[in-house]
Amino acid sequence: MTDTTGPLERDRHRTVFGEVAEQYDTGRPGYPDRLVSDVLEFTGLPAVEALEVGAGTGKATRAFAARPGVTLTCLEPDPRMAAVLSRTCAGRPHVTVVETDFETWRPPDRHRFDLLLSAQAWHWTAPEVRWSLARENLRPGGTIALFWNDWYVSDDALREAVAAVHDRHLPDRPPHSILEKVPRDSVMARDSWVPRELLADGGFTDVTHRQYPSVHHRSTAGLVDVLSSLSFYRALRPATREALLADTARAVDAHGGGLRLDTRTGLFLARTVAGG
């Protein structure tokens, strides 16, 4: 996961997920329970008021909302994603969904939170303001938790077959973990742009990085759902996307009709400087 998008591309791409909101919710792997426990433990609080940025359909929201003492205000700019989020979190009075983007939203009465979390979404925020806004929305000593999943096809022959399909349809395709070999260490490394920006901002301390391996199994249709939810697929011309996904499905079917996704979740934690 990198952060090289410009403002126009970022604004366009962060709202393409709503085109396949249901596939996004059913297809994408969730987040490890251990990660949720570690984030809440890092706050050091028995009850946590959390602000979630780019909540999507609630993949992370539901995991945190299931924990006692956690209340969530969830920001999601895409109305289609927000609709799924509202539905999947219905009946949870401690979850509030706000259809807005992080950059323009302001909390009522300048309220500040114990925890700001963002799952698979922080790279879509505006680099020039995201860290200052995070500090403004957090209490002194509050926690920021940013995490991403990277997915890898563990079967070498299948991965090579899927990569060959992509190379045929998209010779200039952007890199993605799902087409790469499983690394020994998470690509969400300690020296990625996240800790560099956190430290450069000067308003955060106790910067911490953790990794969580997990395994998920997907059918051919399940993999197509995962791929369909990726931003660079959504940005393709429909005819190109449909042909690419159809040939990918045929490649998976030829290798047994299912696959194992080795998932590496990278988590970055930090605290706002006390007294900030």
How would you name each of these model-derived features?
Residues 114-128:
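A short SAM/SAH-binding and catalytic strip from SAM-dependent methyltransferases
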Residues 130-140:
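A short glycine-rich, Lys/Arg-flanked "PGG" loop and its adjoining helix->strand segment in the class I
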Residues 29-48:
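Conserved alpha-helix/loop element of class I SAM-dependent methyltransferases that forms part
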Residues 106-116:
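A short acidic, Gly/Pro-enriched loop at the edge of an enzyme's catalytic core
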